[in-house]
């Protein structure tokens, strides 16, 4: 059982890291704002992944189309090995998110209570996530 938990943790951590890196790159490259990304993830990817895993989704799309899409998109996806400048600047200036009241978003006390309540009740293993309304 412990080995299975380790495997699940490894998979989850790596998938989150890939999504995290690309989200930061989209903001850094001024392709989208944090709000844009949160909205898209909550209303598209998140909903799809709640009912089917990536391979189940790709099986429905068809591997020929997935291969074509991957051939184009993979050229554009970040492969940076370092955190983006905007993230380093925020951390260096003490903007740590909910903990300090600011990050990519400004957090009032009411916002902090709301986001913690939302994530605590979501079934997520995280007590606090990075989404904002």
Predicted regions and their residues:
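C-terminal alpha-helical interaction appendages
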Residues: 24-26
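Structural/interface elements that position substrates and couple domains in central-metabolism enzymes
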Residues: 16-22, 42
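Short-chain dehydrogenase/reductase
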Residues: 9, 13, 17
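NAD(P)-dependent Rossmann-like dehydrogenase/reductase catalytic/cofactor-binding core
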Residues: 1-7, 28-29, 34-133
